[in-house]
Amino acid sequence: MIIVISGPPGSGKSTVAKILSKNLSLKYISAGHIFRELAEKEGLSLLELNKKAEENFEIDKKIDREIFRIASTEKNIIIESHIGGWLLKDIADITVYLNASIEIRAMRIAKRDNIPFTKAIEQIIEREESHSRRFLAYYGIDLSDLSVFDLVINTDNLQPDEISKIIEAYLNFMLAKNIH
């Protein structure tokens, strides 16, 4: 079973993927974690590495190759990745897109990173613009095209455990119908 969770920053990808990993006994893989490790190793902030990645496609390719390798060789995993749904749509059993309003996402990020709300908004806008430019230029991926996803969930008014229950119910429905 390969489940891919995608979505913009602050949508709840990591939190929900970790809950599902535990509930379904799946190995948790985070593209964001790999990206953050690279930023730390390079002595850069996430925004700085995003800007560097706009100039150097190899940064994204390296991370995406590693995620693709893992998805191609391991089973029983859940992958959390901004663009995983697009890149892994032919490998994944189920692709899920989580979204939330920019205000809710900024509140979550401000709380998580202990930064002012306005700074969180600025970071979200910068990261999303960087992602949109890079992924369209490098892969031809339009981040507004959600047609590749099996399930799209607005997380504004839902708790992480509620979101995971929705995904688990969908998964059980699809398995019962033998569709994936």
Curated annotation (Swiss-Prot):
Keywords: ATP-binding, Cytoplasm, Kinase, Nucleotide-binding, Transferase. Gene3D superfamilies: P-loop containing nucleotide triphosphate hydrolases (3.40.50.300). One of its GO terms (molecular function) is dCMP kinase activity. It is found in: Cytoplasm. ATP binds at G7, P8, P9, G10, S11, G12, K13, S14, T15. Its EC number is 2.7.4.25. GO terms for biological process: pyrimidine nucleotide metabolic process. One of its GO terms (cellular component) is cytoplasm. Its main location: cytoplasm. The keyword Protein transport does not apply. InterPro entries: Cyt_kin_arch, Cytidylate_kinase_dom, P-loop_NTPase. It catalyses: CMP + ATP = CDP + ADP; dCMP + ATP = dCDP + ADP. It is an enzyme of class 2 (transferase). The keyword Lipid metabolism does not apply. It holds the Pfam family Cytidylate_kin2. HAMAP family: Cytidyl_kinase_type2 (MF_00239). Belongs to the cytidylate kinase family. Type 2 subfamily. This is Cytidylate kinase. It comes from Sulfurisphaera tokodaii (strain DSM 16993 / JCM 10545 / NBRC 100140 / 7) (Sulfolobus tokodaii).
